[in-house]
Amino acid sequence: MGDLDEIAPGSQPGLDWREGGVPVSTRFDDPYFSLAGGLAETRHVFLAGNDLPARLRPGFHIAELGFGTGLNCLALARVAQVPMRMTSFEAFPMAPEQMARAHAAFPELAALAADLRAGLSDGTAIRVDSDDFIHFDNPTELPVL
């Protein structure tokens, strides 16, 4: 059986926590963001690397594999000048408490992060800084759209 057979609905990641509040996947031995500056990494790789601030237009839709802590989403929401659409797939979603611990490393994103976590608790649609954000935790629980 492959790795996908090990993914149970509602599976949460196994996490270790490194200095500075960096979550590290015990399954993949991989930090969720840079140990030396997660937000700087996100701004360089995700935002600048994809030229997203300049490319973001009404109707532009971003798809991502691995939502993780939601740092890419939060960083983009912080700079977005138009409503953003983002779809992300996560096999091992973090619990809101785990996200809160990870988000503590980014005080400048605190308000957006709190809105994100509040909406994730019911696993449906949430509003983040006046934009719609839809999060589905588990494909077996998806509503009919």
Label every PLM stretch briefly.
Residues 66:
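Conserved glycine-centered beta->alpha loop in an early N-terminal alpha/beta scaffold
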